[in-house]
Regions:
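C-terminal segments that line or cap access tunnels to active or ligand-binding sites in enzymes
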Residues: 1-192, 199, 205-206
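Juxtamembrane helix-loop transition sites at the ends of transmembrane segments
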Residues: 196-197, 210
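Short, glycine/acidic-rich hinge or "gate" loops at secondary-structure transitions
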Residues: 206-216
Length: 216
């Protein structure tokens, strides 16, 4: 499977903003879109997570904006791994700052000014701007082999392993990278795989009580 199923690096950016969704120009508090300008082409508004976070009363965010996309960096690499990882992080930071300054207005029109992103709207940024402000938010750079995003390339389904096909006793596989029937890098595929893995563990049929159109 590892010889035929391809992967790609990815990046995720999460920012906390003090204004609510209406002030930022969002039509609704929870919106998810994809297919925007690469590499940061996916956006989700996620205020439903704020209840679990503890913020100072004078710096409390009302909006959480999550962005992600592919970070197409070479792998394998001949560089020393710490150097490679640092270079990837630097590229991701540059992509994130450029995105916020020049492209985020499509999603959050109320978070931009004539000169770029309204950095002062970030919760927890302490008046910083640009890369310094970004350092107070969350930037995930997923380039380690175990973190890379598994692609759904035509013709590669046959090389994916099912949850019950590890080849070892007492080892059951689970994850969106397995052959779950959906075979796509998403939460739905991960859930399907997890349900099938659970059925294998307790000795039931792999599709026990699983319904859907994606089953092979």
């Amino acid at each position: 499977m590892t010889s035929n199923v391809r992967t790609i690096g990815s990046m995720g950016l999460q920012i906390w903003l003090r204004p609510d969704h209406e002030a930022l120009g969002l039509a609704a508090p929870a919106i998810t879109t994809s297919g925007y300008v690469p590499p940061i082409d996916t956006f989700a508004s996620m205020p439903q997570t704020l209840w679990a976070e503890d913020w100072p009363a004078d710096d409390r965010p009302l909006t959480v904006a999550y962005f992600c996309g592919a970070l197409d960096v070479p792998w394998p690499t001949t560089e020393d791994l710490p150097v490679y990882a640092q270079r990837c992080r630097q590229r991701a930071r540059e992509e994130a700052v450029n995105f916020l300054d020049h492209l985020v207005g499509v999603h959050l029109p109320g978070a931009v000014t004539e000169t770029g992103f309204a950095w002062h709207l970030l919760a927890g940024a302490n008046g910083e701007r640009g890369g310094e402000a970004l350092a107070t938010q969350h930037l995930s750079v997923n380039v380690d082999p175990s973190d890379r995003y598994v692609l759904s390339i035509p013709g590669t389904d046959e090389y994916r392993l099912r949850p019950d096909e590890s080849g070892f006793d007492n080892l059951v596989l689970a994850g969106d990278w397995t052959d779950s029937g959906l075979n796509s890098g998403c939460i739905e595929a991960a859930v399907l795989s997890g349900l099938q893995a659970a059925n294998v563990i307790v000795g039931r049929g792999r599709y026990h009580r699983i319904r859907g159109l994606y089953l092979p």
